[in-house]
Amino acid sequence: MPRTRVNLQKSEANDRSFTISSLEFCLSQLRKADPNLVKKAIASGDGLTESKNDVSTRLSEAHRYSVQQCLDNSEQLAQLHNQLVHCDNVFERLQATLYSFQDNLGSIGQDMKNLQLQSHHIHQELENRQKVRVELSQFVDDIAVSQTMMKTINDTDANDRGFLEALHELHHKITLILQRGNGDAVAVNDTMPILEGLKLKAVVKVREWLLQKMFQFRKPLSNYQVFQHQLLKCRFFYEFLLHHDLISAKELQDEYIDTISKMFFTYFKAYATRLFKLAMKDVATKEDALGSIDFAKPAGLGAIFSSKQHVVRNKATVFSIGQRHQILSDDFLGALIVPHAATQNHQSYQFEALFRSIQLAFVDHYSHEYLFITDFFLVSNDEAIELHNKAMARAMSVVLKSCEEQIALSWDAISLHLCICLCDKFTEVLAEREVPEVSDYWNTVTSFLWTRLNLVMSQHYESVKSVDLKKLMHSGSLDARPHFIVRRYAELTSAHLMIAKASGKEMGAKMEAVLENSEDSIEQLLTRMSAMQQTQKNKHVFLINNYDLILSIIDNEESKHTKIYAIVHELEQKSIDDFVEEMLEPHIGYMIKFVNECESLIVQGHTQLLVRYNDKVGTVVANFNAKWRPAVDSINSECIQLFTNFSLGTTILQTIFTKYVQYINRFTKILSHDVFAKNPVCSQLVNVHQVMLEIKRFKPAY
C-alpha cells in the first residue's frame, strides 16, 4: 500500500490533470492493495506524503533491528553455515557412493545375464545327453537278447504264459530293428542272427500249437467254441506268424477254414436228419384241401387189408392257426430243439418249429463264425466275407438241401407262410448283429417257400372250384346255414392275416394276391351253392350267413383295414340289401311298385301320366291299413329264424323295418302331391308314427 501511495503522489505532483486511462490504472492498483490497509489509510485522513514518511521510518527501524539481530547471533549463524557446509560434503560423498553402487549393480546385472545364458546352455546339453541316453538305452534294450528270453523261447511250452510274453518281446525286438535299419551298429549285426534263430524256433512251436488246436475241432461231439476261445486267448500266435512267416500263416488259415467247413457240414447234416424226424404225424396232406369233403376213414374189409396207414388227426389244426403265430414273437429266439431229448420225451413239432430251430442254429453259428474270423485272422470287409463264405459254404448247401426236401413235402399253407416270415426276421437279426446278410441264401429259401405256398394254395383253389355240390345236398337241397368249407376258408384267411400282423410288417403284394385268389374261388363256390337254394330269399340268407361267418372269424382291428375284409363286407352288404327288398316284397310289394313308378314320373314332371294313379291310391291305402300290423309281426318272426347269428338277425330286422318306414314316408310324400290332394282316401292312411310305435316293440333290449 505504501507503494500505491507513492505512485499516486508522484502522479499528482507531475500532472494534476487525470485522464481516463490514468484513472483506470489507479483503480486497478487500488484493487490490488490490501483492503484493510486502504480502509485504514482513508480512515486516518493522512496524505500520501505523510504515509510515505511513516513507512520509510518504519522500514529503517526494521532494517536496523534485523542487522542488530544478525550481529547478536553471528556465532550461531557461523555455526549454522559450517553445519550446512558439512552436510553438503556428506551429501556429496553419499552421491559418489550411490553412483558407485549403481555402477556395481550394472555389472551384477550383466553377470546375471551371462550366468543365465550359461545355465541355458548347460540345461540344453543335459537334455541332449538325456535324450541320447534314453535312445541309446532303448536301442541297447531293443537289440539285447536276454538269457531268460532265449531259454523261454527254446524250452518253455507254448501253453505257458511266459512263452507268450517272450514271443511279444521277440516280435518287438525284430520289428524295431527292422524299422531302424542295421546302420553302422556292430551290435545289431551280432544280435540279428540270434533273433533270427529264435524266430525260427518260435515259428515252429507256434505253428505246431495252432495245428494241434485246430485238429481238436475234428473230434466228434466236441464243443468247437471252447477251442475257439483258446485260440482267441493266444491270438498273438497267429499274428506273429502273419508278420514273420506268411506261408505258415496262410497254411493255418486254409487248414482252419477246411476243418471248420467240414465240421459244420457234418453237424448240420446230422442235425437236420434228426430234427425233421420230429415232425408231427398229423400234419396236413394233399387230401386236406380246402374243398375236400370226405374225411372219413375207409371202413370194412378194405380198411383192414389196406396197406396204407391212416392217421386220425384233428382237422381243425389244418386251417386254424391257434397259437402257432407266437413263433414270430415270443418263441422266435427260444431255445433250439434238441433231437435226442425230444425223442426221449416223445415230443413232436409243427414244420415251422423245426424250420425255426435249424435256421436259428445256422444264424447263430454263422454270426459267431464271422466274428471269430474277423477277430482271430485280423481281416475285415471283403477279405473277411470271402473267408466266412468259404467256412460256411458246405453248411449252407446242406441246410438248403434239407429245407428244400422238407418244403417240397409240406401241404400246410400256414406253416409255409410262417417260415417265409421267419426268413425275414432272421435277416433282421443278422443285420442287428452287423453280420453279412447272405441275401442269396435267404432269397433261395424264400423262393422255395413261395413256390410251395403257391402250389398248396392253388391246390386249395382247385379243390374249391371242383367241389361236387350234389355231395353237399341233403334231401335234394342245401342248408342255408354257414358251410364248413367257408369256415375253413375263413380260418385259413384269418391265419394268414394274423401271421402278417405277428411279423410286424405290412402284407406284401404276393400274399395279397394269394388271398384275393382264395377269396375269388370261395365267392364262385358260394354263387354256385346259392343258385341251388329253392327260393330267392334262401339264396340271400345263405350268402349273408356265410359272409357273416367269414367276417366274424377275421374280425379284428388290423383285418378291418385289409382289402379282403373290404371285399367280403361289400358282398355281405349287397346281399343284405337284396334280402331286405325280398322280405318287403310279399308284404308291401304293391306300395313299393307304386312308389317307384310315381317318383319316376314326378322327377320327370309327367303330371298328366300321374293322374291315372289316382284310382290305385285307394287300393294301396286299403291294403296297407289292413295288412301292416300282421306284416310287421310276420317279418319279425321270419327274420329271426333265418340267421344263425342272433345279433346279425336283429340288425337285419332293424334294417328291414327302417326300409319299411322309408317306403311309408315316400308313399306319404307322393300323396301330398297336387294330383292326389283332392283324393279323400289319402287321409285314411295309417299314421307313420303309429307304425313306428309298433316296430319299437321288436327293438332288441341290448
Curated annotation (Swiss-Prot):
The gene is vps-52. One of its GO terms (biological process) is retrograde transport, endosome to Golgi. This is Vacuolar protein sorting-associated protein 52 homolog. Residues 505-535 form a coiled coil. It comes from Caenorhabditis elegans. Ubiquitously expressed, with particularly strong expression in neuronal cells. Specifically expressed in head and tail neurons and in the pharynx and ventral cord motor neurons. GO terms for molecular function: small GTPase binding; syntaxin binding. Keywords: Coiled coil, Cytoplasm, Golgi apparatus, Protein transport, Transport. Its main location: Golgi. Disruption phenotype: Enlarged lysosomes. Reduced brood size. Egg-laying defect, slow, but coordinated locomotion, and reduced levels of unprocessed and processed cargo in the motor neuron axon of the dorsal nerve cord. Acts as a component of the GARP complex that is involved in retrograde transport from early and late endosomes to the trans-Golgi network (TGN). The GARP complex facilitates tethering as well as SNARE complex assembly at the Golgi. Plays a role in the trafficking of cargo to dense-core vesicles, probably through association with the EARP-interacting protein eipr-1. Important for neuronal function. It is found in: Golgi apparatus, trans-Golgi network; Perikaryon; Cytoplasm, Perinuclear region. Belongs to the VPS52 family. InterPro entries: Vps52, Vps52_C, Vps52_CC. It comes from the Eukaryota. Component of the Golgi-associated retrograde protein (GARP) complex, also called VFT (VPS fifty-three) complex, composed of vps-51, vps-52, vps-53 and vps-54. Within the complex interacts with vps-53 and vps-54. Interacts with the small GTPases rab-6.1 and rab-6.2. GO terms for cellular component: cytosol; GARP complex; Golgi medial cisterna; Golgi trans cisterna; perikaryon; perinuclear region of cytoplasm.
